[in-house]
Design a protein with these regions (language model features):
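Juxtamembrane/disordered regions of integral membrane proteins
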Residues: 1-171
Length: 171
C-alpha cells in the first residue's frame, strides 16, 4: 500500500471523510440509544458551548443549566460536521505526513484506530467543558460517555479511512 495522491487531495479527502464519518457517528449514536447507551451530548448543547466560546466562556458548571441561546441547534450541527467532523479529520493526514508515513498499515484499519483516538476529544475537552468532568463522570443521569464515545467514534474513523482510500491515493 502506497500513497500516490497529492497532499491537497489527501486533506480534501480527509475533510470529506470526516463529514461522512460524522454522519456514520450520528447513525451509530441513534442505534446505541435504543440499547440505552448515550453520551448525554446533543447538538443544541454543542451549539451552546460553541456560542459560549465566542464569548470567551470556555467551560460551564453544567451546560444543561446554562441559558439556551438563539440558533444553538443550527450552530451545533454546523460545528459537529465542519469542525468536529471535517476539521478533526485533517489531523489524520497531517500526522501521517509529519511522520513521513506513506500509508497506514491498512487505510480502513488506520481510520478505525484514528476514530478510537478521537474519543479522547470528548472525554478530555468537550465533556469537562460541559461541566461533566473527565470522561463525562458527572454527566446526565443514564449517560455513559465512557462507552458511548469510542463506540460512536469507530464508525467516524472508518468513514475517514474509507474516503481517504477512495479519494486521495491510498491503495
Amino acid at each position: 500500500m502506497n500513497f500516490t495522491g497529492s497532499p491537497m487531495n489527501t486533506f480534501t479527502s480527509a475533510f470529506l471523510g470526516g463529514i461522512i464519518g460524522a454522519v456514520l457517528m450520528d447513525i451509530t449514536e441513534t442505534a446505541m440509544a435504543r440499547f440505552g447507551i448515550r453520551s448525554g451530548v446533543n447538538v443544541s448543547l454543542v451549539g451552546r458551548w460553541f456560542l459560549g466560546l465566542t464569548r470567551v466562556r470556555l467551560a460551564h458548571t453544567d451546560i444543561q443549566a446554562s441559558v439556551s441561546m438563539p440558533h444553538e441547534a443550527g450552530l451545533g450541527w454546523a460545528f459537529h460536521f465542519l469542525i468536529g467532523g471535517g476539521g478533526v479529520a485533517l489531523i489524520y493526514p497531517a500526522v501521517l505526513l509529519a511522520m513521513d508515513v506513506t500509508s497506514p498499515v491498512h487505510p480502513i484499519l488506520g481510520g478505525l484506530m484514528f476514530g478510537l483516538v478521537t474519543s479522547l476529544l470528548p472525554w478530555l475537552v468537550l465533556l469537562p467543558a460541559f461541566g461533566w468532568g473527565w470522561f463525562g463522570r458527572s454527566g446526565p443521569a443514564g449517560a455513559n460517555a465512557l462507552l458511548a464515545s469510542p463506540l460512536s467514534h469507530i464508525p467516524y474513523g472508518i468513514g475517514v479511512g474509507a474516503v481517504m482510500t477512495l479519494g486521495s491515493g491510498f491503495q
